[in-house]
Design a protein with these regions (language model features):
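Secretory/organelle targeting and membrane-embedding segments
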Residues: 1-211
Length: 211
């Protein structure tokens, strides 16, 4: 989850929390749970929320070597931020889920401010086949699914195709499916609408927060 902007006028409140609590806990863990949870047993909101909780309980505690944090240049000069603040504006973490489905599969979470772009994406890298037909080194870009959640919505499927000619040489391409022509509700407007209708699927339950 990358943001081009800094903390702007929220220096004091942001400095008391940081990227882990503001972004990872509130946003990225929700995305992680939706992406990796088992199918819910019913269509009710509580069924999906139950699966999210079980998923988070299976997340292994993150080791110090798998956690990197930092600040963007100029963060400490923001009004409300202490001159010796150690609060992170960037975080990258590697975690594992101790379940049969996700055993030994590394999952990376990254979030930061003052990044080159503003975008929230999920990148799923597929396992490599036991043998490459082209006999050349193939990067992960040739076998992935990329899901952009914001600011726009699209899905990209990474493939490797043969280049024209006699030689067996491939190149990486990405097929993109873009959602267009549909007016998307602003995020908080959707949440408020769900709250008024009693739909709790997108809300964090207490046991989810504690997990």
């Amino acid at each position: 989850m990358a943001e081009r902007t800094g903390v702007q006028d929220r220096g004091q409140s942001y400095d008391a929390t940081g990227a882990v609590r503001v972004v990872v806990q509130n946003h990225l863990l929700q995305v992680l749970a939706v992406l990796t949870m088992d199918p819910p047993t019913g269509v009710q909101s509580e069924a999906a929320r139950d699966e999210k909780v079980w998923l988070l309980k299976a997340v292994r505690p993150i080791a110090a070597r798998d956690d990197v944090r930092g600040q963007y240049a100029g963060y400490r000069s923001v009004p409300g931020v202490g001159p010796d603040s150690a609060t992170e504006s960037f975080v990258a973490a590697r975690l594992y889920i101790d379940s049969w489905r996700w055993a030994d599969v590394p999952i990376y979470l990254r979030a930061g401010k003052k990044m080159p772009v503003t975008a929230t994406e999920v990148w799923v890298e597929f396992g490599k086949p036991p043998r490459e037909t082209s006999g050349e080194h193939v990067s992960s870009a040739s076998s992935h699914m990329r899901m952009r959640i914001s600011p726009d919505i699209d899905i990209g499927l990474g493939l490797r195709v043969k280049q024209p000619g006699e030689r067996m040489v491939g190149k990486d391409v990405e097929l993109i499916l873009t959602r267009s022509g549909i007016a998307n509700l602003p995020p908080y407007q959707r949440l408020l609408g769900d709250a008024l209708r009693g739909i709790g699927q997108l809300f964090a339950r207490e046991d989810f927060v504690m997990a």
